[in-house]
């Protein structure tokens, strides 16, 4: 059994077939790195177990949400951890002064929730429909009106 599959409650969420790995080897950049596997954790506990396996086996992990990076940050030849599907929560707090969102929530979805409070995230990447908060935090994109 693949130790990364054992870190997930449902081992079917570790994708090792060539077709699954090939479709995730590109982000929006020209770089192409074929991951060893693609993991789809559903919660922080599974992410923690993936980190433990990664450290124990010396296999690097890279997180991917929207795959909109123009610089190759969403690619790896290690384990690719896809947060797009299961980490989309958005909680607007304090009348829009704060927002708590998962790394898979898109900038557009967060801004739609904040608009009800007369607020939005800035700056604004052109890829807001696909760009996620995980990328915004980890890759510091500037956007069109910076």
Language-model-derived ranges and their functions:
Residues 73, 82, 102, 138-140:
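Short beta-strand-to-turn element immediately C-terminal to the catalytic PLP-Schiff-base lysine
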Residues 86, 97-98, 105-110, 132-133:
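Short, structural beta-strand-to-alpha-helix junction motif
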Residues 70, 108-146:
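A gly/ser-rich beta-alpha-beta helix-loop segment of oxidoreductase catalytic cores
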Residues 43, 104, 135:
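Conserved phosphate-binding and hydrolysis motifs of nucleotide-dependent enzymes
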Residues 64-66, 102, 124:
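Structural motif
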Residues 1-56, 66-97, 126:
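N-terminal flexible segment immediately upstream of the FAD-binding catalytic core
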Residues 58-60, 120:
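Residue-level detector of anion-binding/catalytic polar loops
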């Amino acid at each position: 059994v693949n130790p990364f599959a054992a870190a997930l409650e449902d081992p079917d969420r570790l994708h090792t077939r060539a077709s699954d790995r090939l479709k995730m080897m590109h982000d929006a950049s020209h770089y192409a790195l074929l991951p060893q596997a693609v993991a789809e954790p559903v919660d922080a506990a599974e992410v923690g177990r993936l980190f433990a396996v990664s450290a124990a086996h010396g296999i690097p992990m890279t997180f991917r949400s929207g795959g909109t990076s123009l610089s190759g940050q969403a690619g790896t030849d290690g384990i690719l951890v896809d947060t797009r599907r299961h980490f989309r929560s958005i909680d607007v707090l304090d009348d829009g002064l704060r927002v708590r969102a998962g790394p898979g929530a898109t900038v557009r979805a967060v801004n739609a929730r904040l608009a009800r409070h007369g607020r939005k995230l800035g700056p604004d990447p052109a890829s807001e429909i696909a760009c996620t908060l995980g990328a915004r935090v980890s890759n510091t994109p500037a956007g069109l009106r910076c």
